[in-house]
Each structure stands twice: as C-alpha cells, then as structure tokens.
Amino acid sequence: MSNIEDRVRKIIIEQLGVDEAEVKNEASFVDDLGADSLDTVELVMALEEEFDTEIPDEAAEKITTVQAAIDYVNSASE
C-alpha cells in the first residue's frame, strides 16, 4: 500500500476496528465510526508513526473525518 489514501484507510480500519466498507471519505470518526476521544488520539499517533510526521494538537482537533486525515497527510508530505 504505497498510496497515501490506502495507507490512511488501513490505519483507520486497524485503530477503530471497523469494516473497510464503513470507511468512506466523508465518514466522521466519532459520529459514523464510533470512535471516542481516546480512539482519536490513538489514531493521530498511528498516523504520525506511519507517515513519520508530527501533527500539532490544533491540527489534530480538525482531523475529524477520513477525508480530513487524508488531506492532512497529503499536505504534510508535500
């Protein structure tokens, strides 16, 4: 999985224990995928590790959907 979008989706599936079909771009981690605040912190940490980047708290608070995570990683890797 070299594609950023695929890698982000894989992390979300593993961290939240959700089915691949549920991980749509517009899906909210909390409202659609059942994540709680601890899940979202762990998700951000997993993204940081996978993409070897640091996500500041103010940016992490804005990463609330699958697409937001993909967009952030894309912009951080440019």
UniProtKB/Swiss-Prot annotation:
Q: Which GO terms describe its biological process?
A: lipid A biosynthetic process
In its record, the post-translational modification comment is: 4'-phosphopantetheine is transferred from CoA to a specific serine of apo-ACP by AcpS. This modification is essential for activity because fatty acids are bound in thioester linkage to the sulfhydryl of the prosthetic group.
Q: Name any GO cellular component annotation.
A: cytosol
Pfam families registered for this protein in UniProt: PP-binding (PF00550)
All copies of the Carrier domain together span 2-77
In the record, O-(pantetheine 4'-phosphoryl)serine modifications are located at: 37
Q: From the UniProt record, give the pathway where this protein acts.
A: Lipid metabolism; fatty acid biosynthesis
Q: Which GO molecular function annotations are given, in alphabetical order?
A: acyl binding; acyl carrier activity
Provide the protein's localization.
Answer: Cytoplasm
Q: Which InterPro entries match?
A: ACP, ACP-like_sf, PP-bd_ACP, Ppantetheine_attach_site
Q: List the disulfide bonds.
A: none
Q: Which UniProt keywords apply?
A: Cytoplasm, Fatty acid biosynthesis, Fatty acid metabolism, Lipid biosynthesis, Lipid metabolism, Phosphopantetheine, Phosphoprotein
Family membership, please give it.
Answer: Belongs to the acyl carrier protein (ACP) family.
Q: What's the stated role of this polypeptide?
A: Carrier of the growing fatty acid chain in fatty acid biosynthesis.
Which PANTHER family does this one have? Answer: ACYL CARRIER PROTEIN, CARRIER DOMAIN-CONTAINING PROTEIN
Enumerate the HAMAP family for this protein. Acyl_carrier (MF_01217)
Name of the featured protein: Acyl carrier protein
Q: What is the lineage of its organism?
A: Bacteria, Pseudomonadati, Pseudomonadota, Gammaproteobacteria, Vibrionales
